[in-house]
Amino acid sequence: MPKTEREYRQDIVDVGRMVWQKGWVAANDGNISIRLDQDRVLCTPTQVCKGMMQPDDMIVCDMKGNKISGTRERTSEILMHLTVYNLRPDIRSVLHAHPPVATGYAAAGRSLNLALLPEVVIGLGCVPLAAYGLPGTPELTDPLLPLIPKYEALLMGNHGAVCYGEDVYKAFFRMETVEHFARISLVTELLGGAQVLPKQEVTKLLEARTRYGIRTRAGLEFGCPLAAEELGQERFQVTREEIIAMVYEAMCAQK
């Protein structure tokens, strides 16, 4: 049974609070929306802390961004949300936030495009980086246009991240995965570099999506994520017998 508009408003309140509690937004950062139907979108207002919203704070606007109802002004970045909905009819919710580590990668001009974690390869493929665009203007959306149809989560140059999904909780969980992936990626760099999965394993993971009921095509035809072979990495693999032989030779050399 479809949710009521009131229930959707409460969903945005709940997700906004979780985003704020996790430290993915500061002050009035971030915005959230849910597509109510073909003609209307429910979105967060501008200039409000996402951890302190109430259901009645939300704005209903049309697919051109014009306010239909609400006592506050809509988010200034509604165009980004509408662009996602126009390019992806399967999407019902969009979440934009500034998770610190993922945003650090975006500010450094770095995408999260390596095949490091099975869960990320299966669920997101990878998280590409879109060029910087001035917030609150069409310049913000333009760099996203070629990427939105291909991926489920994007980094935004010097800005943050945007995730979208079939509902607001799916968008939230994708944002959580992006930040988790960014933190692990950073740790691998601090430890001297990542051991990237080989192409054969990436292919197996992408094929496993059907088994898990995951419908995204990210990573299947767009050159992302990058496997070990594409980075010139060779995975060092030896058998148990070879290890024993190497240890024996090393011990003999010390005599």
Listing of model-derived features with the role each one plays in the protein:
Residues 1-255:
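Glycine-rich flexible loops
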